[in-house]
Amino acid sequence: MEVFTKLKEGALLPEYKTSGSAGADLRALIEEPIILKPMQRCLIPTGLSVELPKGIELQVRPRSGLALKHGITVLNTPGTVDSDYRGELAVLLINLGNEDFKIENGDRIAQAVIAQAIQADFLQKDELSNTERGAGGYGSTGIA
């Protein structure tokens, strides 16, 4: 699938690191380093805009290594980029770790996953069909 991109000066295309990668790395495009303090959040620009085919979305997801090693994650994960959005992609990062985290220009800060997006027809109904689970949620199926 082709995804057309527009890059600001200095921005880099998303990059898959292996042939089996589902996520392509997104990089920060910043003039000066950003220090993300514990529990602080910041919107990090990428310098990237995309033109997605209708029926496709781009999901912005955390990088597992940043989450494990530093507590850095995408706050609104997965962030959804709709097919009709043409603005610059930015990544809302939060530091859930205990130490300051430094973000520099070109750092890989998140990953982009391309997915199908289906628009449903929502219809109102007085009663929904019964299931074994019913209305149980939030741990109702147990832990083990």
UniProtKB/Swiss-Prot annotation:
Recorded catalytic reaction(s): these are: dUTP + H2O = dUMP + diphosphate + H(+)
Q: Detail which positions bind substrate.
A: R63, S64, G65, N76, T80, V81, D82
- Check the record and name the Gene3D superfamilies matching this protein: 2.70.40.10
Tell me its EC number(s), please. Answer: 3.6.1.23
In which pathway does this enzyme or protein participate?
Pyrimidine metabolism; dUMP biosynthesis; dUMP from dCTP (dUTP route): step 2/2
This protein's UniProt keywords: Hydrolase, Magnesium, Metal-binding, Nucleotide metabolism
**Enzyme group, top EC level?**
hydrolase
- Look up the record and name the cofactor or cofactors this protein needs: Mg(2+)
Annotated GO biological processes are: dUMP biosynthetic process; dUTP catabolic process
Pfam families in the cross-refs: dUTPase
Q: Does the keyword Kinase apply?
A: no
Entry's Gene Ontology molecular function annotations: dUTP diphosphatase activity; magnesium ion binding
Q: Which PANTHER family does the record associate with it? A: DEOXYURIDINE 5'-TRIPHOSPHATE NUCLEOTIDOHYDROLASE
Q: Which family is it part of?
A: Belongs to the dUTPase family.
- HAMAP family the record matches: dUTPase_bact
Purpose: This enzyme is involved in nucleotide metabolism: it produces dUMP, the immediate precursor of thymidine nucleotides and it decreases the intracellular concentration of dUTP so that uracil cannot be incorporated into DNA.
Name of the featured protein: Deoxyuridine 5'-triphosphate nucleotidohydrolase
- Organism of derivation: Treponema denticola (strain ATCC 35405 / DSM 14222 / CIP 103919 / JCM 8153 / KCTC 15104)
